[in-house]
Amino acid sequence: MTDTTKIDYSKTLYLPQTEFPIRAGLPQREPLFVQRWEEMNLYKKLREQAKDRPLYVLHDGPPYANGNIHIGHALNKILKDVITRSFQMRGYNSNYVPGWDCHGLPIEWKIEEKYRAAGKNKDEVPINEFRKECRELASNWIKVQTEEFKRLAILGDFENPYTTMNFHAEARIAGELLKFAASGQLYRGSKPVMWSVVERTALAEAEVEYHDIESDMIWVKFPVAGEVATENDLSGSAVVIWTTTPWTIPGNRAVSYSSRIEYGLFEITEAENDFGPRPGERLVFADKLVEECCAKAKLQFKRLRSVSAEELGKIVLDHPLKGFGGGYEFVVPMLDGDHVTDDAGTGFVHTAPSHGREDFEAWMDNARQLEARGIDPNIPFPVGDDGFYTKDAPGFGPDREGGPARVIDDNGKKGDANKVVIEQLIAADKLFARGRLKHSYPHSWRSKKPVIFRNTPQWFVYMDKNLGDGTTLRSRALKAIDETRFVPAAGQTRLRSMIEGRPDWVLSRQRAWGVPICVFVDEEGNILQDDAVNKRIMDAFEKEGADAWFADGARERFLGARAGEGWTQVRDILDVWFDSGSTHTFTLEDRPDLKWPADVYLEGSDQHRGWFHSSLLESCGTRGRAPYNAVVTHGFTMDEHGKKMSKSLGNTVTPQDVIKESGADILRLWVMTTDYWEDQRLGKSIIQTNIDAYRKLRNTIRWMLGTLAHDEGENVAYADLPELERLMLHRLTELDELVRSGYDTFDFKRIARALVDFMNVELSAFYFDIRKDALYCDAPSSIRRKAALQTVREIFVRLTTWLAPMLPFTMEEAWLDRYPQSVSIHAEQFRPTPAEWRDDVLAEKWRKVRAVRRVVTGALELERADKRIGSSLEAAPVVYIADKSLSDSLEGLDFAEICITSGISVSDAAAPEGAFTLGDVKGVAVVPERAKGEKCARSWRYTTDVGADPEFPEVSARDAAALRELQALGKL
């Protein structure tokens, strides 16, 4: 007989055993996995493993190689990493080639700052020496960012990334430009572009942001020209315009009106102002706006008559500066314009084609008719690249006493241009009124200083030129948008509206660090079309990089025998958006491990006007379609209160800090649980919420590992599995569909939420809780225990592989704990799900079982709260079920086991008054009762058969049988 007084029953239980730590220690542990993956060259192993699978390509939008990564970079790269990993684990060869955008102004600025600190003059430094320093700076930052991305567990070909400054890349970018030139899409023109005086360069729309500023606003009188106004009584009157840019008045060439607006002729009857209109003056306004304008100028008025659009179209005006500075003697025509409204102002728009896109378009639309009327259609250049007026602004430019006035100075401060123009308008008695206005105004995203619209000679790509097949670049791009999948769908509308309304594409920048516009032109601006010259350029760039264009003797080298023909070498460089828009050519097309077009591009929502946009135009212009099949967009990261992160506000969260304090997997979990396509929030409390969620997840994984330490790999036939195990396998089937669908649609939050809920609600609080008794206490030969181990094994494999793309460090740690000889969880595939696991009938039955169970657990929670019981095993409640479908669902089940009680009774009798109920489960009531019998010293269940086996008098018959079996195996 066994001496039971010497048995430590806890040592007879199959309790979880694992070295998987409860404390993650991610900041210390994660770098070890980074090192492991590096040493084993995991990326290369995955390529070899998947070489015969279909390719899936996410093309990396290149971050700028300048500075440490910020939270936006982390969000972006994590999303990309999850996509590439998930497709790899679903049977694809999912390559990821990281890239960097290397040219452009920010890097030039860094070198120029260094020069200024050293007292060097950039203009005295040979251009290729300057470019060399830019290249070195970009290279250094690529190294820094590479390590930062790896620390986030970004898996990619970091040994062979792409960069826009690579010699081959520069050659291909130049080649793409030459394709536009050869097809006639590239032209030199002059247009008003957004110009940064501070940076001395034109800016693309993507390089501009808007901030509120306070500006001068003026109302200006344009007299009706006397010699053409004799046929009606508008003679001697004036048309009044309103503008917030007084400095553009010297560039005025027309006044626009709208045939949709009602206008009138008004006479001033009283005036209380120090300057401006006097009684008797007659002025033309939009009827809707005259009262507001005259109130501003402290005037009383009366309406004389209506003025028709037809009448306005026949008159011309005098320039308000006529007679000043020996210029402005030309007439100012009236143009009918769709852009004119009577929402604000006067109903007339001051039109300076040198200084506004709509002004330019209105002027060019009428250029032919204006020339026929004897009006010079040429557009002046009133403001230079330094913000000073030129000779095209007589009286304000170099001919002005004291030198030219300036719009904006080198520091981005307002110059004296507004002041001197307003003074001259007052002197000429052409100022109607003046004031100040706070409004949104464009600023350079880099310098944060205001920009101006100024007419400049630039290189453009036509948006609306017939490309020989009846299409235009615009029509091709719009068609491509319709053929592209957008996530979220609103991105399609956004990009379409931008393409529909955009002007011709400005390609040129007047800077040094970039790929040159490598063409030669004659005096008229015609581009040299010579295949031999182009080949010499391309060959040189391939071997030496784009520096070859700026080397001494480059013109003669490339032109060869044509050097004496008078061709001029263009010195401008390409907009960096053309660089990044061309990345598909030297990555997707040129690399054998990739393919064109890409399956997906993923970037922030600002890239609808940036990389998505430029890539679309570049590819449609040279290949007729988009370089991508799908576009996924994410929002921006705000602080936890929804405010924009700012160093000045002290509310920034850096990925480096989160990783150092909590680990990269915490940051990745945050990304996975946000609505990333919208703006997200991040701060200390949100990070803590994710830490708490991670701990629960980790504990669930840890429990499974501990339980599976006793798993000998035995399988029970599906038909022999208990219902509870079959229910869990059914749930795995449902989750498998959800996970695969979620990864397909990039809906990561849906996956993360479903898996976390499954682990917390269905595993920890339900299945595992129920099965702990069988797993810990049943005999080694127990079918129930073997079935539970088998099911936990299936759950573990699926959960860890499903979560591996999201939490690569933690799932690798768990996988190697379970399978120490494995290469990596990231070399695994999502497991196929047997069709027999799906059982919708069983799931519906258990929906009812769990409903009844909720009423029981609710009743027992009250008993515990009132300290009538300490554990549910002390209870044997009576359950009254009036709904037959609910009682039928319990047939054949050990409902006490499911409720984790030592006993349970089910009755169809009427429930006694005071029985516990839940409002959402009709027809079920519970009366708590204490369990009968004695407490088993091993399982702690109360049974009436404790001591039935005299050799083990302290335990139940089930536990005694288990002990006998352990004894026979020599484990007792």
From Swiss-Prot:
Enzyme Commission no: 6.1.1.5
Which GO MF terms are attached to this record?
A: aminoacyl-tRNA deacylase activity; ATP binding; isoleucine-tRNA ligase activity; tRNA binding
InterPro entries linked to this entry:
aa-tRNA-synth_I_CS, aa-tRNA-synth_Ia, Anticodon_Ile_BEm, Ile-tRNA-ligase, Ile-tRNA-ligase_type1, Ile-tRNA_ligase, M/V/L/I-tRNA-synth_anticd-bd, Rossmann-like_a/b/a_fold
Subcellular location per UniProt equals: Cytoplasm
The biological process GO terms on file are: isoleucyl-tRNA aminoacylation
Motif range for 'HIGH' region?
63-73
Keywords of the record, alphabetical order, are:
Aminoacyl-tRNA synthetase, ATP-binding, Cytoplasm, Ligase, Nucleotide-binding, Protein biosynthesis
Where along the sequence does the record place the motif called 'KMSKS' region? 644-648
Top-tier EC class: ligase
* Annotated binding of L-isoleucyl-5'-AMP, by residue: E603
Q: What does this protein do?
A: Catalyzes the attachment of isoleucine to tRNA(Ile). As IleRS can inadvertently accommodate and process structurally similar amino acids such as valine, to avoid such errors it has two additional distinct tRNA(Ile)-dependent editing activities. One activity is designated as 'pretransfer' editing and involves the hydrolysis of activated Val-AMP. The other activity is designated 'posttransfer' editing and involves deacylation of mischarged Val-tRNA(Ile).
Report the domain remarks. IleRS has two distinct active sites: one for aminoacylation and one for editing. The misactivated valine is translocated from the active site to the editing site, which sterically excludes the correctly activated isoleucine. The single editing site contains two valyl binding pockets, one specific for each substrate (Val-AMP or Val-tRNA(Ile)).
Can you name this protein? Isoleucine--tRNA ligase
